[in-house]
UniProtKB/Swiss-Prot annotation:
One of its GO terms (biological process) is pantothenate biosynthetic process. This is 3-methyl-2-oxobutanoate hydroxymethyltransferase. It is found in: Cytoplasm. The active site is at E180. The gene is panB. It comes from the Bacteria. The lineage of its organism: Bacteria, Pseudomonadati, Pseudomonadota, Gammaproteobacteria, Thiotrichales. It comes from Francisella tularensis subsp. holarctica (strain LVS). Mg(2+) binds at D43, D82, E113. It is an enzyme of class 2 (transferase). Binds 1 Mg(2+) ion per subunit.
Length: 265
């Protein structure tokens, strides 16, 4: 997938869209060689890569650094970058400066969270030539309002509000919407009522696509195992075993061997 046109086509043809997060050059190069459709440089990188408490601590400088790294490694992939916490809530000028910074760092599109107070901003960004992806449901930047990472849309009123939000984001010009941690039947209803694709994370299988944090699906974080994550490998054990083998071989002087040494001329 090279552009937003790919998202539109996927919605029409009902081809599922695959997305993962990425925050660094090395993993971006690996992803670039895969069949993945799109990469999200998420503000979650502040937590996953930098060890911050939650995404409200991720800065624009962090996002620029990670976006540049991913863009350098994944040269053939469509890249979406998150606008970090409060970067689009201060003024239109600071919002557009943040958008420009991420696009000039290598992103092809921008994602922001929520609808309330964002619709005019989204329209302005889209009118400026920058594609926007929306994000509703459990929006991590609102963690302090939610009282933690909690499933959203579990009441009839909340479900109705989510559908209204999704339609407003579509009308504002979003080319796609992330649905995070909402009941599967609600996600299905939203998906069927939009002409733009939905990307689910903890939203069931009836969205137009899926996204996971790369380190989660690779089993690299043993402390974070939410219900919606499938571990495709036990990355934590894989890496730990490899490092411990290296340590043992070093102490036993079985590494390096001749094949790893340079000969005299």
């Amino acid at each position: 997938m090279k552009s937003v046109l790919g998202f539109k086509k996927a919605k029409v043809t009902q081809e599922k869209i695959s997305m993962v997060t990425c925050y660094d050059y090395t993993l971006a190069k690996i992803i670039n060689s895969t069949d993945i459709d799109c990469i999200l440089v998420g503000d979650s990188g502040g937590m996953v890569l930098l060890g911050k408490k939650n995404t409200t601590y991720t800065t624009l400088d962090d996002m620029q650094f990670m976006t540049q790294a991913v863009a350098n490694g994944a040269t053939d992939k469509f890249i979406v970058a998150d606008l970090p916490f409060m970067s689009y809530r201060q003024s239109l000028e600071t919002t557009m400066q943040a958008v420009m910074a991420l696009i000039q760092s290598g992103a092809h599109a921008i994602k922001l969270e929520g609808s309330s107070g964002n619709l005019d901003i989204i329209k302005h960004i889209v009118d400026s030539g920058v594609p926007i992806m929306g994000h509703i449901g459990m929006t991590p930047q609102f963690i302090n309002s939610f009282g933690g990472f909690k499933v959203q849309g579990r009441t009839e009123e909340a479900a109705k509000h989510l559908l209204e939000e999704a339609k407003l984001l579509e009308q504002a010009g979003c080319f796609g919407i992330v649905l995070e941690c909402i009941p599967a039947n609600i996600a299905k209803d939203i998906t069927q009522n939009l002409d733009i694709p939905t990307i689910g994370i903890g939203a069931g299988s009836n969205t137009d696509g899926q996204i996971l944090v790369l380190q989660d699906m690779l089993g690299m974080n043993t402390d974070f195992q939410p219900k919606f994550v499938k571990k495709y490998i036990d990355g934590s054990k894989l890496f730990s075993d490899a490092i411990n083998t290296y340590v043992k071989e070093t102490k036993a002087n079985t590494f390096p061997t001749k094949e790893h040494c340079y000969d005299y001329c």
